[in-house]
């Protein structure tokens, strides 16, 4: 889908670049496949802010997307493509031959009327699902499982994809968008193709108010605060903070490594950080 720009009638319109969603379905989602969604405003169950700068925004209903795709060897027809406010990608409403409806992540080049299927050995075409071990090397995939049968977890954002670059016994070597190469079990399933809406990365929000519609509140800099509020606060006149960047709680930020999951280190063949050096 193409990008839309607008006549500069206001400063916000001048900067605004949006994805043209005119080809998507314009009605409401299927009620049986939606759930209510409460806005937390960044607060936990005790009412304390646990995530800063969240709150407000347009009310949203959650579309229950099928990330497992475990209905094997039952063909489904794409009924329509829809917008989903809960994710950057578009979703597709599919109807299985037995009459069941489901939402799936829409891959690129999937059109209304197309037939898709999940199975152990299926055609390599966008929207079809099969175990990674049965896919040819070089296949572009998305919505990849990390644990067998848990449902897709990798490559689900707009425009993302991974590529199968090799095999190692029971495992498949997958190269992710970040450049990381990791081992995934061959019985884990993936969906063929890249995720829809690749132009999302080229959009411009245009104005602060649009971010408020999305539920994001203004982000305050530490150097603009008082010493009681932030380690970078205070000082006479404008200062740069005077120390290495830290969070409001004094922990190093901007580049400090936080990964501690040693048990899965053995599955990472090439770190995304090593690729940049």
Swiss-Prot record:
GO cellular component: large ribosomal subunit
InterPro entries named in the record: NA-bd_OB-fold (IPR012340), Rib_uL2_dom2 (IPR014722), Ribosomal_uL2 (IPR002171), Ribosomal_uL2_bac/org-type (IPR005880), Ribosomal_uL2_C (IPR022669), Ribosomal_uL2_CS (IPR022671), Ribosomal_uL2_dom3 (IPR014726), Ribosomal_uL2_RNA-bd_dom (IPR022666)
GO-annotated molecular function: rRNA binding; structural constituent of ribosome; transferase activity
GO biological process, one term: cytoplasmic translation
SUPFAM superfamilies: Nucleic acid-binding proteins (SSF50249), Translation proteins SH3-like domain (SSF50104)
Start and end residues of each stretch annotated as Disordered: 222-265
Transmembrane segments: none
Record keyword RNA-binding present: yes
Keywords, in A-Z order: Ribonucleoprotein, Ribosomal protein, RNA-binding, rRNA-binding
Family membership: Belongs to the universal ribosomal protein uL2 family.
Subunit structure: Part of the 50S ribosomal subunit. Forms a bridge to the 30S subunit in the 70S ribosome.
Biological role stated in the UniProt entry: One of the primary rRNA binding proteins. Required for association of the 30S and 50S subunits to form the 70S ribosome, for tRNA binding and peptide bond formation. It has been suggested to have peptidyltransferase activity; this is somewhat controversial. Makes several contacts with the 16S rRNA in the 70S ribosome.
Family matches, as NCBIfam families: rplB_bact
Name this protein carries in UniProt: Large ribosomal subunit protein uL2
Species for this entry: Bradyrhizobium sp. (strain BTAi1 / ATCC BAA-1182)
